[in-house]
Amino acid sequence: MIELFTADTPNGWKISIMLEEINFDYKISKVNLSEGEQHKPEFKKISPFNKIPVITDHENNKSVFESGAILMYLGEKSNMFYPEDNRLEINQWLMAQMGLIGPMIGQHHQFHYYHPVSYTHLTLPTICSV
């Protein structure tokens, strides 16, 4: 059985979706980020950067952190969505999502929904004089 340590974030959702698609038995353990549960010593043992998601595969007692690494692990383990002959292309797009697309969307959401500030009143000369 796979245990998924997660929270309600896009990276956490990716793993839940994959686990559903590959039809693996899994248990969800919610990590309360606002209460700092990700900083507890027992969590740091499985997630050295104190981030979610993380899985523990109780069949072999291995833990995997980082959403991309987890997706690759589950793809290999299930023999689904990660065929050997397409892994180069899959890995390229996965890394692009993790390193470029995902963070940019995250920044957009952070500033658009949680810290909205209008900059429309600033003109180019005002911006350049700062």
Residue ranges and their predicted role:
Residues 1-118:
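GST-like domain detector, emphasizing the conserved glutathione-binding G-site
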